[in-house]
């Protein structure tokens, strides 16, 4: 099974080698036919502490790095 790749915005870089990335998805409500925006936060491994709040990054699934980290920052 291929690894998922998501794109989002860094919302926190407070922890060492970890960034929090907010990923937004849009879909049309089946009944209301209205476009709805939902977001989810992922904690991703940032080896070099290179990314700051507001950066747009791509993250990829990986083996668990810690209790909450299952993603790595792929590129900006």
Swiss-Prot record:
Alphabetical keyword list: Ribonucleoprotein, Ribosomal protein, RNA-binding, rRNA-binding
The Gene Ontology CC terms held by the record are: cytosolic small ribosomal subunit
Q: Name one GO biological process term.
A: translation
Q: Which InterPro entries match?
A: NA-bd_OB-fold, Ribosomal_uS17, Ribosomal_uS17_bact/chlr
What is a single Pfam family found in this protein's UniProt entry? Ribosomal_S17
A single MF term (Gene Ontology): structural constituent of ribosome
Family to which the UniProt record says this protein belongs: Belongs to the universal ribosomal protein uS17 family.
| NCBIfam families listed in its UniProt record | PRK05610.1, uS17_bact
What is the role of the protein in this entry?
A: One of the primary rRNA binding proteins, it binds specifically to the 5'-end of 16S ribosomal RNA.
Q: How does it assemble?
A: Part of the 30S ribosomal subunit.
Instruction: Please report the name of this protein according to its UniProt entry.
Output: Small ribosomal subunit protein uS17
The gene from which this protein is expressed is rpsQ
């Amino acid at each position: 099974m291929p690894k998922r790749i998501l794109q989002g915005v860094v919302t926190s870089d407070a922890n060492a080698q970890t960034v929090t990335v907010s990923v937004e998805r849009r879909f049309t409500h089946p009944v209301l036919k209205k476009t709805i925006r939902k977001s989810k936060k992922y904690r991703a491994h940032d080896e070099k502490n290179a990314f700051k709040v507001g950066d747009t990054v791509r993250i990829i699934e990986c083996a668990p790095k810690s209790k909450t980290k299952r993603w790595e920052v792929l590129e900006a």
